[in-house]
Structure formats: C-alpha cells, structure tokens
Amino acid sequence: MLVTVGSMNERVPDSSGLPLRAMVMVLLFLGVVFLLLVWQALGSSPNSEDDSSAISTMTTTTAAPTSTSVKPAAPRAEVRVYNISGTEGAAARTADRLKAAGFTVTDVGNLSLPDVAATTVYYTEVEGERATADAVGRTLGAAVELRLPELSDQPPGVIVVVTG
C-alpha cells in the first residue's frame, strides 16, 4: 500500500532574503547601468569633442568664404627685463614669472634709470609691442607707458623695469 503525504511539486518558500530571480535581475540591472556609465565616459572624452568641433569649424570656415574674417593675432614682441633697484635677482625673478606666463624674454640684466619709482612696462609704436606690453602689465600688475627717451638706445621690444 502506497501512501502519499504531499505533492512533490510543492515549493517551500525561503523567507531568508530575496528570491534568486530577483537578485539576478538586480545584478543585471546594475551591470547594464555600469556599462552605460563607462560607455558615456569614454564617448565624451575631451579629445573627441575638441576634434569633432575643430573639424566642423574648419569645414564651416572653408565652406563659407563670405563669413566674417577674424583678425589675425598681433605678433608678440620680445620682452627685456631690467633691474633698476638694489634688490639682487629682482629682474631674474620677474623674467621667470613672465616666461612661465608664456612671454619671450630675451634679455635680463641691470639698468640705471633714476626717475622711475615703480615697476613699469615700456613699449614703442612698433606693431605688437602695445598688446604685449598690456599683457605683461596685467601679468605683473604694473603700469604700462610709452618708452622713455632714456630708453631709446635699447633694442626693439617691450622693456620691463623692476624696482624690487
């Protein structure tokens, strides 16, 4: 005689946590989110955006010859830095600052110029000197003026006199 106590197909619920299917679905979802974030990060690298915008800009510029032309940047003048104070190394420190800011410093030395009380940037009317002098003045926080007659024997370029 055969006695059946219960059906073999009955499931006993496991109340210890999430069902296995739910846990697999959550893990798959998190994996997809992670892959999307990686894909977005790789797709939006600064180099790829810069390259594509540069290409489209270049294409637009050549395709539209009637567009407004951009004035070419004025040439940067050479910069000479002279110490007119008794502070040793003042011109060299200033020249290093200007080089770090991207200026072309061609001469560093000492100079005698008695009537200047503060660090000043001097320029002539040669093309590019005024713009360079203004940029140097902003970098150093110094006044910008036309070149003094006492500096007429100096070679062309922007002259920075450092008072210390």
From Swiss-Prot:
Superkingdom as given in the UniProt entry: Bacteria
Record's subcellular location: Cell inner membrane; Cytoplasm
GO biological process: symbiont-mediated perturbation of host innate immune response
Membrane topology: Peripheral membrane protein
Keywords assigned: Cell inner membrane, Cell membrane, Cytoplasm, Membrane, Virulence
Primary location class: membrane
Reported effect, residue 61 to A: Affects glycosylation; when expressed in M.smegmatis
Protein role: Virulence factor that regulates vesiculogenesis. Acts by regulating the production of mycobacterial membrane vesicles (MV) bearing Toll-like receptor 2 (TLR2) ligands, including the lipoproteins LpqH, a major host TLR2 agonist, and SodC. By restraining the release of most of the material that activates host cells through TLR2, VirR reduces the immunostimulant potential of M.tuberculosis and increases its virulence. May contribute to cell envelope integrity. When overexpressed in M.smegmatis, it modulates the production of IL-10, IL-12 p40 and TNF-alpha by RAW264.7 macrophages and it decreases the killing of M.smegmatis.
Name under which the protein is recorded: Vesiculogenesis and immune response regulator
Gene: virR
